[in-house]
Amino acid sequence: PCPGLDQSTVTVTVVNPPDPGTNGAVSVCSNGAALSLFAQLGGAPQAGGTWSGPSAVVGGMFTPGTMSAGNYTYSLPAAAPCPAVSSTVAVTVNQPPDPGSSGAVTMCSTGAAIDLIAQLGGTPDAGGTWSGPSAVVGGMIDPATMSAGVYTYTVAGTAPCPDQTATV
């Protein structure tokens, strides 16, 4: 070294920022099982954050029957000099279809046609399909032209809710 030249040392430390993963989305059925919100995040999220959203989150779990749909935010605190970060899971809650409850009817072979949906209990969703021993047209059964037997009313579910059925 040159005489009279001073030296200084600078230490550079690089800190990796916290990783909350990437945003996610999930659809659940309102009568479905609880699920982990953390598992819905993409990437490799770092554990140890906190959840916030339209409903209180306990243990990182979303329970469809008791929690509201909406955006749930996973937040990790700052790791100086890196700022706090967060990712969001958008939760959609779908209602299961309601085909009503099964019913029964006894008809005279010379009787008038009847509306099958009126034979179901409860409040069946409209728009379902009928199947049975004879083709059902307009939801009506005509004892003079159709076969006796079990007729099934099927209402399609919105994923992940499965289709539901009731019978007459």
Task: Spell out what each predicted region is.
Residues P1-V168:
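Proline- and Ser/Thr-rich low-complexity, intrinsically disordered segments
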